[in-house]
Amino acid sequence: MLPFVERFRPIFEHYNLDLIIPEVHERLSEEELLAYAGKFDGTICGDDRYTRRVLAVCTPRLKVISKWGTGIDSIDLAAASELGVSVGNTPNAFTVPVAESVLGYMLAFARRLPWMDDAMKAGQWEKIPGITLSECTLGVVGVGNVGKAVLRRARAFGMKLLGNDIVEIAPDFLVENGVEMTTLPDLLARADFISLNCSLNPTSYHLINAQTLSLVRPSAVLINTSRGPVVDEPALVQALQAGQLSGAALDVFEQEPLPAESPLRSMPNVMLAPHNSNSSPFYWERVHRNSIRNLLLGLQLPVEDLDSLRAEAQPQ
């Protein structure tokens, strides 16, 4: 939200809220947050590291953490609960743009579009063979809001659909969309495209590792738009180098920004993006508003008039 916060200053002023706007490149580290300890009552944050140590020194003044977006794995929820800090997020925030990013990656790999573009610009005239999505099986790991949206869209392309989740998925959705729920090993062994759409928690940390990658078919492509640590990155690099899978599309990484020396940067069969699959000004605007709403609720301020308050016009 930082690039747009000035647009919403009139709304914060309406509620007599003073703003502290730190300089942030990607996220605030534990040490950087400690510098603001005791100086704020609430925060709208991204993936800033609200550890137990940070929360302990920020309370009792800190009352609410409003996460801009969905994932709250960077917040120590147990410590927040113990210290009386409410935590809010914006579920279903970026379902559509993330789902469309997954479909874009699948189409790019299936139709070999980036590789033909590179060849043409290098002066070559090479007809690289492609496949259609209707020939392929998609396996979605994490059939939540984003996972469901990916499956619905993939169904329109005639793909065979597999799902895996640790919670039971409504039978109506599965029947309506022709999704077969199965075990993770079976999904990995059968899928041509594997889309990771699960949240990061103790059950999903390094879910994709050397052992699970050994189950993947050599022609498969791994797509991760969820959280970087869901994948054991060194194990993925090794698997790609060994030809255990044919490619990967990665929007998230174990360390962000991705280090310049990462082997992933030089792999021709890997597509990379800087944690940007949520990119959509339309959906950003909804998340801005909902993040402010969660902040106000945590500060026990009235929200009835929030929707009537206007931010400054968005630059064209």
Kindly give the residue locations of the regions a language model identified.
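C-terminal helix-to-coil terminal segments
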Residues: 8, 14, 81, 88-101, ...
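N-terminal glycine-/charge-rich "phosphate-binding" loop or analogous flexible N-terminal tail
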Residues: 1-40, 314-316
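Phosphate-binding beta-alpha-beta segment of Rossmann-like dinucleotide-binding domains, i.e.
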Residues: 83, 90-137, 149-152, 156, ...
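Glycine-rich Rossmann-fold phosphate-binding loop(s) that bind the pyrophosphate
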Residues: 143-144
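Conserved beta-strand positions in the Rossmann-like core of class I SAM-dependent methyltransferases
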Residues: 20, 162, 229
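Short acidic/histidine-rich motifs immediately flanking catalytic phosphotransfer sites
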Residues: 35-42, 59-62, 189-194, 217-220
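Rossmann-like adenosine-cofactor binding region
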Residues: 51-52, 168-263
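Phosphate/diphosphate ligand-binding glycine-rich loop within oxidoreductases
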Residues: 39-117, 131
